[in-house]
């Protein structure tokens, strides 16, 4: 989707990187995909979770580095959470790892704020936090982008919209696990009428 297109656009500008392209006719052919993956140095997966897991299963070349933008491997054993800002050693860990899971958009903002506070003991791991996260509509994929950029766009889309308020959002698992929290935060994701960008707010009580 949009993530893959952005990565490709940025890499095309680099003279030190050669992109391996699959014939569009064979993009869903597992043999053709496996060939491309295994002759690469680095493969980015910008796929739904199930498809990402299937793609990882195609890897036979141990030298291939997989960077997965889906939620499939963010808390999985054997995968490095790709947020170098977490510690002074994290950058080298991400660089050397053969399996890197890209943080979710909401989760990345939350983890960046909360992880150091828990790590330093300022916020106890047992606390139940709340988080409000505003995001642009591009994160919703092609369908949502089309809705927001349509000439017949509903007036209702001009205001921020909450969604996923049942505490089942796919980013909650990594928010909790990476920060070492014992309880999932109460999460309010909100999509807004701008293309991309994030604003993440985590209120803290003075008694902490």
Give, region by region, the residue ranges found by the protein language model.
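N-terminal Rossmann-like NAD(P) cofactor-binding subdomain of oxidoreductases
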Residues: 1-163
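Charged docking surfaces used in two-component/phosphorelay signaling
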Residues: 140-208
């Amino acid at each position: 989707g949009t993530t893959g297109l952005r990565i490709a656009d940025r890499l095309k500008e680099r003279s030190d990187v050669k992109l391996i392209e699959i014939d569009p006719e064979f993009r869903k052919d597992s043999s053709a995909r496996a060939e491309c993956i295994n002759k690469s140095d680095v493969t980015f997966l910008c796929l739904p979770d199930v498809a990402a897991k299937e793609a990882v299963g195609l890897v036979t070349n141990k030298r291939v580095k997989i960077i997965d933008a889906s939620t499939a491997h963010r808390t999985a054993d054997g995968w490095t959470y790709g947020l170098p800002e977490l510690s002074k050693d994290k950058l080298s860990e991400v660089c050397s790892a053969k399996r890197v899971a890209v943080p979710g958009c909401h989760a990345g903002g939350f983890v960046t704020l909360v992880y150091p506070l828990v790590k330093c003991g300022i916020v106890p791991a047992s606390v139940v936090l709340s988080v409000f996260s505003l995001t642009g509509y591009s994160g919703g994929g092609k369908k949502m982008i089309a809705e927001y950029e349509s000439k017949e766009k509903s007036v209702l889309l001009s205001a921020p919209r909450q969604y996923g308020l049942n505490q089942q959002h796919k980013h909650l698992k990594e928010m909790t696990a990476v920060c070492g929290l014992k309880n999932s935060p109460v999460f309010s994701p909100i999509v807004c009428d701008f293309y991309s960008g994030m604003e993440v707010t985590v209120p803290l009580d003075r008694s902490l």
